């Protein structure tokens, strides 16, 4: 009976979403506050209904209710509890319900924290959110019902794909969806503003926190997905330019551009049309990613094998929402007034360059991802666009972007001093070149671009720190005064610096592991020794083991350095009982920021086994940098001036330019300190 209650709750959520999408819009047209006020209440009710529905499905998984088809297809009574729970979203139907839950969650957050929004704008934003929720609720109920019953109920389930039985699955999809779906709020704000014909600095101020939150979650989701693929799939790589990986990366690139564009709009009321377009594009790319994963057009470890009719349904949603939003944009954009004028050399100019490069990079990834699909649809020819294309084109685009990033915070709004900014960045650039030279000579030449890329990473990190040092006046005033000035800076300044530092750390990791990792493929018998990097690995033999729902053959390796044993590594091949599906579990040991990675291959007729061993220098910088970027997003969100629904006093503080906090403006600092 409880399963039917979950299904009925989903139907009621659909009805509530329809009410939320219709009546508040009528209220706006009629100027009726009571109808407009329905939007917030309906959003909260819709969230509670979908949350109840999701809880029911989770209960069915935990109790192994195999009368539910979705549970039977993706669970097993022997599966550990954590994987029973994560199995809820380890399949198409359950993950779509999670998608819908997060969508209505964001609607509820707008309803709760958007109290200071203009009543008409809030009603329109929640109405657009409801239109999206209505479409996906119909999609779930009509094509992807997670509550379908099996009669009679099977005695045992088929189990979840063993590759997905990993703790990473508990974290990766929810984070990814929080990023994907979080951009729906930006989309709804853009559509609502176009409907009202009013877009100004206040609009950008309202959009920025939602953009920042979605960007932070998406950064976390992509990083977690990359690390999961690295350690779980046993292939030794961290990014494959898989079409589904690209489908999450494109909204991240566009969302990064939107963050910077919204800042220009907030400060100078410039780039209005462009910012609205980016808000629409970012969520459109999220919807495109949903289509690619669930339409059946891709074969990927990330994709769900689905009925093509589901792809047609999602394609219809794409056409309606993306086509409708762009049509509205084309009709209303010409009515938007142009914003402030600025010189090419200014902070606005640097952010425009940032936007141009990021959108070009997004278009490049989009072209490389969709071109094989379009070509196959038109001609029947199958081609693949692989890593060499993306590495070359995307890498070349990132070089000028990274060179420009440290200049942005050092340039003034409206008109900046390029020579002055370059002079202030001289030390960062010099130390970056020094790091590149040291790297080049340390590896006895080698690829020139690798030391150059490492030097760029160092330059980016030091450039971000330079901005904070200059704002505090460190070295020009007493240490106590510099500390007070530094602590008086807005948290968003620290968030920006952390995000740029994180990008630099990630760049160092990418360049180092790409250029200098070593791979050894060798047949080993017990007692065999192989040298990898600075370490020696001795194969000690295989041992059989058993887990809760699998058996495994685990290989034991002893790691030595300079003849001294330092650690051991276990790498295994598992066979899961229910599906009889083998998996490879890599053995990984960390040394500082570098890792030894061991993966077992095929058994040989002479009693040996093929072993693949990688030495991956500084690979943890890739995900460590992502963590720092995420921390930057969280710190920026904690800035009271950027909180949704911030009080008027805090909103007024936004009028203070970040340049007011530099060391040459002590009066402003003193005023802020006096206010506490």
From Swiss-Prot:
One of its GO terms (molecular function) is heme transmembrane transporter activity. The keyword Signal does not apply. Pfam families: CcmF_C, Cytochrom_C_asm. Keywords: Cell inner membrane, Cell membrane, Cytochrome c-type biogenesis, Membrane, Transmembrane, Transmembrane helix. It is a multi-pass membrane protein. The keyword Transmembrane applies. GO terms for cellular component: plasma membrane. This is Cytochrome c-type biogenesis protein CycK. The gene is cycK.
């Amino acid at each position: 009976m409880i399963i039917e209650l979950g299904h009925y709750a989903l139907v009621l959520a659909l009805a509530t979403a329809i009410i939320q999408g219709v009546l508040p819009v009528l209220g706006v047209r009629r100027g009726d506050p009571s109808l407009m006020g329905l939007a917030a209440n309906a959003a909260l009710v819709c969230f509670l209904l979908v949350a109840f529905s999701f809880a029911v499905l989770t209960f069915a998984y935990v109790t192994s209710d195999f009368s539910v088809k979705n549970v039977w297809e993706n669970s097993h009574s022997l599966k550990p509890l954590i994987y029973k729970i994560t199995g809820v979203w380890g399949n198409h139907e359950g993950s779509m319900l999670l998608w819908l839950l997060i969508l209505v969650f964001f609607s509820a957050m707008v309803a709760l924290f958007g109290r200071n929004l203009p009543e008409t704008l809030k009603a329109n934003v929640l109405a657009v959110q409801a239109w999206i929720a209505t479409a996906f609720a119909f999609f779930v109920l009509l094509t992807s019902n997670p509550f379908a019953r099996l009669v009679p109920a099977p005695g045992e389930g088929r189990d979840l794909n063993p590759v997905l039985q990993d703790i990473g699955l508990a974290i990766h999809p929810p984070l990814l969806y929080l990023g994907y779906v979080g951009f729906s709020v930006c989309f709804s704000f853009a559509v609502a503003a176009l409907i009202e014909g009013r877009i100004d600095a206040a609009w950008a101020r309202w959009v920025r926190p939602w953009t920042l939150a979605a960007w932070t979650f998406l950064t976390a989701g992509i990083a977690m997905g990359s690390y999961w693929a690295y350690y779980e799939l046993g292939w030794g790589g961290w990014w494959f330019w898989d079409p589904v990986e690209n489908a999450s990366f494109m909204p991240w690139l566009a969302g990064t551009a939107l963050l910077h564009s919204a800042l220009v709009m907030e400060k100078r009321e410039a780039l209005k049309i462009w910012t609205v377009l980016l808000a629409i594009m970012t969520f459109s790319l999220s919807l495109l990613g949903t289509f690619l994963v669930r339409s059946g057009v891709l074969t990927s470890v990330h994709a769900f094998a689905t009925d093509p009719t589901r792809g047609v349904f999602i394609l219809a949603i794409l056409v309606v929402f993306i086509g409708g939003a762009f049509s509205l944009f084309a009709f209303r954009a010409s009515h938007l007034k142009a914003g402030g004028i600025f010189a090419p050399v200014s902070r606005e100019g640097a952010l425009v360059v940032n936007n141009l490069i990021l959108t070009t990079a997004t278009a490049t990834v989009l072209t490389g991802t969709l071109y094989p699909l379009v070509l196959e649809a038109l001609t029947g020819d199958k081609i693949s666009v692989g890593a060499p294309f993306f590495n070359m084109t995307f890498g070349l685009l990132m070089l000028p972007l990274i060179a420009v990033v440290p200049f942005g915070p050092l340039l003034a709004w409206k008109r900046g001093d390029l020579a002055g900014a370059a002079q202030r960045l001289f030390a960062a650039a010099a130390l970056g070149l020094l790091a590149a030279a040291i790297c080049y000579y340390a590896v006895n030449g080698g690829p020139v671009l690798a030391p150059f890329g490492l030097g760029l990473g160092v330059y980016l990190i030091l450039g971000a720190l330079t901005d904070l040092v200059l704002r505090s006046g460190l070295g020009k005033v007493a240490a106590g005064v510099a500390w007070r000035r530094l602590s008086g800076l807005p948290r968003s300044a620290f968030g920006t610096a952390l995000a740029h530092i994180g990008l630099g750390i990630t760049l160092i990791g990418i360049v180092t592991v790409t250029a200098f990792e070593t791979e050894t493929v060798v047949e080993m018998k017990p007692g065999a020794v192989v040298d990898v990097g600075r370490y020696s690995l001795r194969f000690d033999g295989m041992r059989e083991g058993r887990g809760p729902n699998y058996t495994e053959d685990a290989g034991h390796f002893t790691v030595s350095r300079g003849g001294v044993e330092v650690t051991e590594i276990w790498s295994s091949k598992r066979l899961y009982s229910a599906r009889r599906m083998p998996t490879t579990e890599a053995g990984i040991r960390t040394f500082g920021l570098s890792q030894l990675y061991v993966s077992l291959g095929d058994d040989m007729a002479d009693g040996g086994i093929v072993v693949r061993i990688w030495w991956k220098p500084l690979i943890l910088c890739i995900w460590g940098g992502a963590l720092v970027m995420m921390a930057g997003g969280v710190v920026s969100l904690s800035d009271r001036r950027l909180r949704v629904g911030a009080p008027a006093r805090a909103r007024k503080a936004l009028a203070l330019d970040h340049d007011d906090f530099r060391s040459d403006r002590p009066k402003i600092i003193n005023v802020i300190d006096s206010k506490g």
